[in-house]
């Protein structure tokens, strides 16, 4: 009998950080004296004085799920001109689960021992003997199709179907079930630990850690770190998309077919992590405590440390014993003040999508060596909560519906292949030029939308939610036409900061995430290829092919900076007003609408690759 023990451990990385504080004079307290700071981090390292760090418990975590599907379909030729297709598919998909139920989530009503018994503790499927989410058992997807020959050269086609996506994959790392035990120095100049003394036993957390007080860090509860996963109760519901189309197919002339169709779909239950914030301050919570976000005095109170006199009537009114006095009043009033995060939901199927399009396609079937396809799409794509960074106010959910960040209303694509025929009576010349294949794919379309800039009014310090700048009506969004091919990025900014205004302190912005007329430069994609197969005998052939990208060598500049309309314009001569005069500015180096010319082109210059392959 032979054997060998195998043990695979994950999450074994940790952190020891060293600071100047441990080798500085205590009275200095990080002050700058004579232009220099006191203390030296490398000296702290040599002495083994650790300022802060993290100990990750080793873990052996495994998440998985199950999926089955059944389908049936049939085609019924009702008459010589009418064909009817029908079918149904059933999907059953579970949500990801840790094999032994060690993945944590939040129990809103359970007392948290680390937070003095305040509601909001951690539970595990292995300890609650429950399932975090429900599995959707009704994912039936019918499919219907119809084709009717109106005339010998004209066919009407229509279709309808319901399709289901899979549930989420296991988007959790080992740290989700084995949180890092972060530690910090108890005071200025004092080490959190020494390398000579090793890691203190109280810094070590067991694995698995199934404590209801696993968050915040039991050894350092003032860090207010929250759980990394809040499993949504509907995590077992797959996304659903309802699709339909109707169109006409017509043979215009011999070997040329035209297709025109309306194609649409509606999606629901797509994964979203941005439509909920379980730990934000709402108007109802503020009203309960007699606070008004529109009152400047109340805003000052919310931003004040709860242990300071600026907190007013909230001074030292701690939500639980041990709550840090340096935390703000706003933090203390959160639904779960023991956590500083928004408690993002995991696998929440709340996103929605909309798509409507007119699609036309012309197909030149193979004849005389030529195959040609031209496709044109005129579409509108909208989404709600599916794409990151696109929610302005989750409490007014439908206000966040906007065009998709991948929206391209107009797209044209040409693809063609042509095989050169025999040329002339000269056999040698004909043999050289014949059978070469020339292919191309040319794609043209609208530019992608630019995300509205995020406000800098610090609303997140009050309500723990961000917002957007306001769009100023009637003010042009651009200073230069992004598609004119006439921009000098060293001298010109392309976006207009005056088109945006910052909401007032404590106010929500009114802008949508995306606007149809606020887009980046159009990005053509043009490629071409040349090739031929030389056959020597039946079993031997040489393939020669040359592929070109950006065949017309177009210059495409980088996308402009569009994050902060209040950002100062900078140039080699300085910043601010001096940069507005091209005669004195030198070269631009930053600002709202700045195109970073130092980063090179958005698309590489024309390049080609030669491929040769010999088969035998």
Predicted regions and their residues:
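Short acidic-glycine motifs
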Residues: 1-480, 484-487, 505, 509, ...
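Flexible internal linker/loop segments at domain or repeat junctions
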Residues: 492-510
């Amino acid at each position: 009998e032979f054997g060998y023990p195998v043990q695979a451990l994950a999450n074994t990385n940790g952190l020891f950080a060293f600071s100047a504080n441990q080798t500085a004079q205590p009275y200095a307290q990080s002050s700058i004296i004579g232009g220099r700071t006191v203390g030296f981090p490398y000296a702290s390292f040599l002495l083994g004085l650790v300022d802060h760090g993290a100990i990750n418990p080793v873990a052996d975590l495994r998440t998985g799920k199950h999926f089955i599907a059944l389908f049936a379909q049939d085609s019924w030729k009702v008459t010589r001109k009418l064909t009817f297709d029908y079918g149904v598919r059933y999907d059953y998909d579970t949500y990801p689960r840790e094999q032994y139920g060690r993945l944590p989530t939040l129990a809103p009503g359970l007392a948290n021992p680390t937070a003095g018994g305040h509601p909001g503790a951690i539970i595990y499927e292995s300890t609650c003997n429950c399932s975090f989410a429900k599995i959707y058992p009704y994912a039936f997807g019918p499919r219907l199709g119809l084709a009717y020959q109106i005339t010998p050269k004209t066919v009407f086609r229509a279709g309808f179907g319901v399709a289901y996506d899979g549930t989420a994959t296991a988007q959790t790392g080992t740290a989700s079930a084995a949180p890092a035990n972060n530690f910090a120095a108890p005071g200025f100049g004092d080490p959190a630990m020494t390398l000579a003394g090793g890691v203190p036993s109280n810094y070590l957390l067991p694995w698995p850690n199934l404590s209801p007080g696993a968050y915040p860090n039991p050894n350092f509860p003032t860090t207010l770190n929250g759980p990394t996963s809040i499993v949504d109760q509907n995590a077992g519901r797959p996304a659903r998309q309802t699709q339909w189309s109707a169109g006409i197919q017509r043979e215009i002339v011999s070997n040329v077919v035209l297709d025109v169709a309306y194609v649409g779909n509606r999606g629901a239950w797509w994964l979203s992590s941005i439509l909920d914030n379980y730990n934000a301050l709402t108007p109802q919570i503020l009203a309960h405590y007699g606070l008004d976000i529109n009152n400047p005095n109340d805003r000052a109170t919310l931003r004040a440390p709860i242990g300071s006199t600026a907190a007013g009537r909230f001074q030292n009114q701690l939500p639980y014993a041990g709550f840090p006095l340096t935390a703000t009043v706003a933090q203390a009033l959160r639904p779960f003040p023991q956590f500083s995060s928004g408690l993002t939901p995991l696998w929440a199927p709340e996103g929605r999508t909309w798509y409507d399009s007119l699609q036309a396609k012309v197909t030149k079937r193979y004849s005389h060596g030529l195959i040609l396809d031209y496709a044109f799409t005129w579409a509108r794509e909208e989404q709600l909560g599916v794409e990151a960074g696109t929610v302005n106010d989750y409490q007014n959910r439908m206000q966040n519906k906007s065009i998709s960040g991948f929206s391209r209303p107009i797209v044209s694509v040409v693809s063609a292949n042509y095989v050169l025929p025999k040329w002339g009576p000269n056999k040698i010349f004909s043999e050289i030029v014949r059978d070469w294949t020339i292919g191309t794919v040319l794609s043209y379309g609208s530019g992608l939308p630019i995300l509205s800039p995020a406000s800098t009014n610090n609303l997140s310090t009050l309500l723990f939610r961000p917002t957007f700048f306001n769009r100023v009506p009637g003010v042009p969004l651009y200073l230069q036409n992004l598609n004119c091919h006439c921009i000098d990025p060293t001298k010109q900014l392309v976006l207009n900061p005056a088109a945006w205004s910052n909401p007032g302190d404590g106010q929500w912005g009114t802008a949508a995430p995306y606007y149809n007329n606020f887009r980046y430069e159009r990005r053509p994609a043009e490629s071409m290829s040349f090739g031929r197969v030389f056959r020597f005998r039946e079993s031997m052939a040489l393939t020669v092919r040359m592929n070109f990208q950006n065949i017309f060598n177009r210059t495409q500049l980088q996308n402009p900076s569009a994050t902060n309309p209040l950002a100062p314009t900078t140039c080699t001569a300085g910043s601010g007003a001096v940069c507005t005069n091209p005669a004195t500015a030198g070269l631009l180096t930053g600002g709202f609408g700045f195109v970073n010319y130092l980063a090179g082109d958005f698309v590489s210059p024309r390049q080609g690759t030669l491929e040769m392959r010999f088969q035998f």
